[in-house]
Amino acid sequence: MAAAAELRLLEKSLGLKPGNKYSAQGERQIPVLQTNNGPSLMGLSTIATHLVKQASKEHLLGSTAEEKAMVQQWLEFRVTRVDGHSSKEDTQTLLKDLNSYLEDKVYLAGHNITLADILLYYGLHRFIVDLTVQEKEKYLNVSRWFCHIQHYPDIRQHLSSIVFIKNRLYANSH
């Protein structure tokens, strides 16, 4: 999914009126937001953070200094590890690392949903939708987290709902 489409989903989930003008710049198609009253903003994380502040939902950026740093860390992870990596090996490594991290966590940063969860959900959707049942079981913690995030009101929107089986079908899947 193109960054502009993700940013429009984020706008809607934040309750912002549509109408921002997005474009893409350079070979890597880095998103750019044309602002009315200032310079253009560039980069998925920068624009998403701006939208959260515009919607007065700063709690999505973390409530403590540590949570804010963790949200930024996961936004960086999203841009550096998820975007532009489409090989099967890259995807498997990414999901394995994320699965280990989520072993004892409900959210990526802290005890509530944050912008990091939302943007990582949008970024991973294209990979998760193609996983087999066995692969979803292999990455059980990612599957649990993803299923939880997709059921938040206004997050999934028009993206396809991904079905996760509650009872394990395969033994020793990880």
From Swiss-Prot:
The induction comment states: By DNA damaging agents, such as UV, adriamycin, actinomycin D and cisplatin.
UniProt-listed Pfam families: Arc1p_N_like
Query: What CDD domains does the annotation carry?
Result: GST_C_AIMP3
- Which interval of the chain is the signal sequence? none
Which residue ranges does the record annotate as region N-terminal?
Answer: 2-56
Q: Which UniProt keywords apply?
A: Acetylation, Coiled coil, Cytoplasm, Nucleus, Protein biosynthesis
Q: Gene encoding this chain?
A: Eef1e1
Report quaternary structure and partners: Part of a multisubunit complex that groups tRNA ligases for Arg (RARS1), Asp (DARS1), Gln (QARS1), Ile (IARS1), Leu (LARS1), Lys (KARS1), Met (MARS1) the bifunctional ligase for Glu and Pro (EPRS1) and the auxiliary subunits AIMP1/p43, AIMP2/p38 and EEF1E1/p18. Can interact simultaneously with MARS1 and EPRS1. Forms a linear complex that contains MARS1, EEF1E1, EPRS1 and AIMP2 that is at the core of the multisubunit complex. Interacts with ATM and ATR.
Family matches, as PROSITE patterns: GST_CTER
User: What name does UniProt use for this protein?
Assistant: Eukaryotic translation elongation factor 1 epsilon-1
Q: Which InterPro entries match?
A: AIMP3/p18_C (IPR053837), Arc1-like_N (IPR053836), EEF1E1 (IPR042450), Glutathione-S-Trfase_C-like (IPR010987), Glutathione-S-Trfase_C_sf (IPR036282)
Query: Does the keyword section mention Acetylation?
Result: yes
Q: Which GO terms describe its biological process?
A: cellular response to leukemia inhibitory factor; negative regulation of cell population proliferation; positive regulation of apoptotic process; positive regulation of apoptotic signaling pathway; positive regulation of cellular senescence; positive regulation of DNA damage response, signal transduction by p53 class mediator; translation
Q: List the top taxonomic levels of the source.
A: Eukaryota, Metazoa, Chordata, Craniata, Vertebrata
Q: Which organism is it from?
A: Mus musculus (Mouse)
Q: Which residues carry this modification: N-acetylalanine?
A: 2
